[in-house]
Amino acid sequence: MVALELGCGYGRVLKRLLPAVDLVVGIDTSLASLRMALRFTELKPSLRLACMDAISMGFRDRSFDLTLCVQNGICAFAVDQQQLLREALRVTRSGGVVLLSSYSPQFWEHRLEWFEIQSAHHLIGEIDHRATGNGVIVCKDGFCATTADQTTFEKFASGLGVTPRITEVDDSSLFCEIVVP
């Protein structure tokens, strides 16, 4: 199995994928993150890293069995979300799986608390509590963190002619699984 992680960051998910696949490719737009991923994953022969944008990937069509964009990447990347899904579908083989994840609405209080801690440590701006709600966290410095709910995932998928399977896990995450036709 050949897997691709979009927005691999420092390699936390890559490291877990390595024992389960023949080859895993991680892409990110941050060279600093990719350098950290090299160290964190201890550069295994079955790992490839590339500095690349997830909405315009330089891979051939149908190159991967599994394409992942987890940890709310579909919202965190600040890109055209439908284009991201279109590209993920393009590079995934027929019968392969595209797997996306975001936060469950049930996880709102925990998520907001985490952002408040980050704000208190000046890692992000002060939270604008009047503008924050419905899965969207807004900071007074202009930063905005969103999520994709079931309806959003279904809308993206139907616009591209594919059918998603949405699963909620532990009242914390929503997973959107699409088997590529």
What are these regions (language model features)?
Residues 10-56:
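Class I SAM-dependent methyltransferase SAM/SAH-binding core
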Residues 82-94:
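A short glycine-rich, Lys/Arg-flanked "PGG" loop and its adjoining helix->strand segment in the class I
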